Amino acid sequence: MFWTRYAGASILLFLMLIHLGQVYPRNDMTNFGCEECKLKENNIFSKPGAPVYQCMGCCFSRAYPTPLRSKKTMLVPKNITSEATCCVAKEVKRVLVNDVKLVNHTDCHCSTCYYHKS
């Protein structure tokens, strides 16, 4: 009797996993919840007829174990190395909104993350 319940529960769990696999899309889920790098209107500084845009979105990033030969050359050895690109402005135009000088982004791309540099 015990084995019948165990087999029934196992089959039920297996069928649920198959169903979940078919329900979810088979696309790349690494950027789940994060849109691609593109221009978006800044609601704080934009005025009717004078929109201000900024670059927003996600780009590439990854982390991996630091190779031993690289670790030996570090002043402060770290076990994890990370690489990243950020959504930055490719082209900008300076604008004046309410006597405040702003930089209006006109084009975006994924490039070096400036705040990661030391």
UniProtKB/Swiss-Prot annotation:
Gene Ontology cellular component terms for the protein in this record: extracellular space; follicle-stimulating hormone complex
Pfam families: Hormone_6
GO molecular function, one term: follicle-stimulating hormone activity
PROSITE patterns per UniProt: GLYCO_HORMONE_ALPHA_1 (PS00779), GLYCO_HORMONE_ALPHA_2 (PS00780), GLYCO_HORMONE_ALPHA_3 (PS50277)
Keywords: Disulfide bond, Glycoprotein, Hormone, Secreted, Signal
Gene Ontology biological process terms, A to Z: G protein-coupled receptor signaling pathway; positive regulation of steroid biosynthetic process; regulation of signaling receptor activity; thyroid hormone generation
Main localization, broad class: secreted
Disulphide-bonded residues: 34-58, 37-87, 55-108, 59-110, 86-113
Subcellular location as annotated: Secreted
Residues listed as glycosylation sites in the UniProt record: 79, 104
Signal peptide span: 1-23
Similarity comment: family membership: Belongs to the glycoprotein hormones subunit alpha family.
Function: Shared alpha chain of heterodimeric glycoprotein hormones. These hormones bind specific receptors on target cells that in turn activate downstream signaling pathways. Involved in gametogenesis and steroidogenesis.
Protein name in the entry: Glycoprotein hormones alpha chain
UniProt organism field: Ctenopharyngodon idella (Grass carp)
